[in-house]
């Protein structure tokens, strides 16, 4: 793929695929057009292992961002001939870690100051697999993969609304944050989806000597920073969560449909996408 100046940062669950059945029904052909025409960067709360499986299935040979902005993964056979400093690597990817290690986050929640809140958390990685399947809608194999966290601690909250607000305030002093992702709360540290978007945007500018236009698409609270920092923002309707309130007056587009059809709908509201696809056809 030749470089063009549009980067599309997209959440996955509830945005690109349905929360209900994890399917892409009705948008597969459109997704393929987007993959061939633009730079689609998945920016999700999902793990490296989950997203890697997804991009392999749909042949998306682009960087992606895992665990709510905690790490950016660059395919070794992708666009870049060089990679950011401080990158680590595995067999298939170079990756830039932006967030805290899971072990560091775990060390904070063992502190006496936070223990009373932790007692109301049901952490994803500690759940019985049947419960993970029930709450995520994933099959057995994918549920096991979702528990293999490197940089975050998703959890179900059993306490009150007042207590979770207090918990959110308490963790800030440790450079941690708690964000809601549609089904689970996520305890993360050191980064978020918006910061990761800016890191990757700036690296594209450095490598290709042009500042790319950024588009962000999401449906939940954990997408808010990404939506705020993008040039164009697409919000996908999600009946299961509160409507995201974005402090932007321009270039915000709201779908009338839920995922996955809402993903196609909101992208086609944006002139740079619509005009480019019409020209290519």
Across the structure, where does each feature detected by a protein language model lie?
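Mg2+-dependent phosphoryl-transfer enzymes with acidic/Ser/Thr/Gly-rich catalytic loops
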Residues: 2-4, 24, 184-281
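Short hydrophobic/aromatic-enriched beta-strand-loop microsegments
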Residues: 61-67, 141-143, 233-238
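Active-site phosphate-binding/coordination module
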Residues: 23-123
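Phosphate- and divalent-cation-binding pockets in alpha/beta enzyme and binding domains
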Residues: 26, 50-53, 131, 196, ...
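Asp-based phosphoryl-transfer active-site loop
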Residues: 4-21, 227
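Conserved acidic, metal-coordinating active-site core of Asp-based
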Residues: 112-215, 221
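Short, acidic loop-to-helix structural element flanking the phosphoryl-transfer center
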Residues: 20-38, 102, 163-165, 190-203
């Amino acid at each position: 793929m030749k470089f063009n100046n549009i980067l599309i940062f997209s959440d996955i669950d509830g945005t690109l695929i349905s929360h209900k059945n994890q399917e892409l029904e009705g948008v597969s052909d459109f997704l393929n057009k987007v993959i061939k025409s633009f730079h689609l960067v998945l920016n999700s709360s999902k793990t490296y292992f989950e997203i890697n499986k997804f991009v392999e299935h749909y042949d998306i040979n682009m960087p992606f961002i895992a665990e709510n902005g905690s790490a950016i993964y660059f395919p070794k056979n992708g666009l870049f001939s060089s990679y950011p400093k401080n990158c680590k690597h595995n067999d298939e990817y170079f990756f830039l870690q932006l967030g805290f290690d899971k072990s560091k986050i775990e060390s904070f929640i063992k502190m006496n100051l936070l223990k009373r809140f932790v007692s109301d958390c049901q952490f994803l990685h500690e759940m019985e697999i049947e419960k993970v399947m029930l709450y995520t809608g994933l099959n057995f194999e994918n549920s096991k993969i979702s528990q293999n966290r490197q940089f975050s601690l998703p959890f179900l909250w059993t306490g009150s609304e007042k207590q979770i607000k207090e918990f959110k305030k308490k963790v800030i002093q440790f450079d941690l944050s708690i964000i809601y992702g549609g089904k689970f709360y996520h305890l993360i540290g050191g980064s978020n989806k918006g910061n990761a978007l800016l890191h990757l945007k700036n690296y594209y500018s450095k490598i290709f000597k042009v500042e790319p236009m950024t588009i962000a698409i999401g449906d939940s609270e954990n997408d808010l920073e990404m939506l705020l920092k993008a040039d164009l923002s697409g919000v996908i309707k999600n009946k299961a969560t509160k409507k995201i309130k974005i402090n932007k007056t321009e270039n915000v587009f709201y779908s009338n449909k839920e995922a996955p059809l809402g993903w196609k709908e909101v992208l086609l509201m944006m002139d740079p996408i619509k005009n480019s696809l019409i020209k290519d056809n």
